[in-house]
């Protein structure tokens, strides 16, 4: 094919539907007749015509329900008798929200439950039918709701009255002894048996709160161990300054008269006082001197040469630096 002289290719033609039918027959394909006759009118599709040809659906249920005859009062099936009673009552705000079942007859030889004939707040007894549908019926007049009144007598006893005109029975009584050492007795009369629980009496001062004793012990502890005004753990150089400012300790430590220089006159006593402050009874001068050597490279405490047990404070002690600026030397105070 010549690229410089080429003619535009003709468009491909699609054969009509009548020709497609014959063409598909050669290869075994089926082509629907898509060609429209010239005299076939095109009308809009209506609702009735558009559903023609679809199979009609059967909306009847496959398994029809049997007709259940309606009863005004379904028969309640009793449950087996059980001594373990659970909460069978319904919520008083919505008595229709739950359904319970009535217990069956009690077997011979067992006492009736105190809850037989119990009713809800609406005066109706719930029952459950065979289909599980709760039904409510009005009870007979003999099962009417009984109200109980409570009254307290002059002797401290509690009386319960059911409002039927009978005698009031003492159902609950508590007696408390007022004097020290008396017995406190609590008595219940439940109709089945009498229960009494004795309690040994105790004197009222014995039931004191431990706050007073704790405060007294804390106060004694503060009085015993509060020997300094420093906040937090005290350091060794601070303790030595405290002893130097205390005139009563001049026999064990004192200023030498030179600037910031002091001498340990009794090193054992100073070590003992330091161990008492830090609550270390095994403190001695060897351990104290190791603590002082720790301050050498920090310019807090330095060793003075030529004299034994003689040290001086360095320039990083803020209290002594302030006194030097004001013109008051520590050595002048001791002289």
UniProtKB/Swiss-Prot annotation:
InterPro entries: Ets_dom, ETS_fam, WH-like_DNA-bd_sf, WH_DNA-bd_sf. Keywords: DNA-binding, Nucleus. Testis. It is found in: Nucleus. Its main location: nucleus. It comes from the Eukaryota. GO terms for cellular component: nucleus. GO terms for molecular function: DNA-binding transcription activator activity, RNA polymerase II-specific; RNA polymerase II cis-regulatory region sequence-specific DNA binding. Residues 94-138, 201-220 are annotated as: Disordered. Disulfide bonds: none annotated. Residues 234-314 bind DNA. Residues 205-220 have a biased composition (Polar residues). GO terms for biological process: blastocyst development; blood vessel morphogenesis; BMP signaling pathway; erythrocyte differentiation; hemopoiesis; in utero embryonic development; mesoderm formation; Notch signaling pathway. PANTHER family: ETS, ETS TRANSLOCATION VARIANT 2. Belongs to the ETS family. Binds to DNA sequences containing the consensus pentanucleotide 5'-CGGA[AT]-3'. This is ETS translocation variant 2. The gene is Etv2.
